[in-house]
Regions:
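Phosphate/nucleotide-binding beta-alpha loop and adjacent structural elements of enzyme active sites
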Residues: 1-235
Length: 235
């Protein structure tokens, strides 16, 4: 039963991603120069977007060493993809990655184990007899603004961020280099399972103050999460 549920979620996520990509194609076309993928996991986003778009250079970041090894294998025969076993943060320092029930839900932020959403999720995984992972590991984190400067990247057509509640710090850490980004695709969790210390309105207002406007919004099935696309009005 757990296997069937996972397949169903993957199917729903696939169709959600197709809608997101259709919007991205409408906004910037099928050919563009640079994608930065923060939170690459096993390369699901990179592999999907590589099939649909012609992208000159892709930079992917995945801090979890086990997920990173799978990512390496999944993109081994593809060109133009640069991957790094780092986390992205507002400051360059070692961080603690809290590994959640499934590896794609790991976060630098702490988990609120008293939240109803957390308890429901664990109950479901126990009921389905799915393997649970809940521990912490040390990871290296770098600042994306510094990376952009070091690589001399003049323009990022698409920045995708899926870091389980750490999105706002990554965005703020871009500082002046946020002006080099055309589209930002991010995920936001409205549940209280991850301790974020910010609200979605903080992200929205920060992006708005940096000349970004919200273009797209879609809810992820069976989760209190939404996908958003923001566009830089200066492009």
């Amino acid at each position: 039963m757990g296997y069937i549920l996972k397949i169903l979620l993957n199917i729903f996520d696939y169709f959600t991603l197709q809608k997101v990509m259709k919007k991205i194609e409408f906004l910037i076309g099928k050919n563009f120069s640079t994608l930065v993928d923060v939170g690459s996991h096993h390369g699901e986003y990179i592999l999907s977007i590589k099939k649909k778009f012609n992208i000159k250079e892709i930079y992917g970041f995945e801090p979890n060493p086990i997920a990173f090894e799978i990512l390496k294998k999944n993109i081994i025969n593809l060109s133009g993809i640069n991957i790094y076993n780092y986390g992205i943060a507002d400051t360059e320092e070692d961080k603690i990655l809290n590994q959640n029930i499934e590896s794609s839900s790991s976060s630098i932020n702490s988990l609120n184990k008293n939240s109803k959403y957390y308890k429901k999720k664990y109950f479901l995984f126990n009921f389905l007899n799915l393997k649970k992972v809940s521990n912490s590991i040390n990871i290296k984190a770098i600042n994306l603004a510094n990376f952009i400067d070091e690589k001399k990247i003049d323009k990022i057509d698409l920045l995708k961020i899926d870091t389980e509640g750490y999105e706002f710090k990554i965005i703020k850490g871009l500082e002046k280099n946020i002006s080099k980004i055309k589209l930002i695709h991010l995920e936001h969790h409205f549940d209280d399972m991850i301790i974020k210390n910010y609200k979605f309105s903080d992200i929205h207002n920060y992006l708005k103050n940096n000349n970004f406007t919200k273009i797209f919004k879609i809810k992820m099935k069976f989760r209190k999460s939404f996908e958003y696309i923001y566009m830089n009005k200066n492009f």
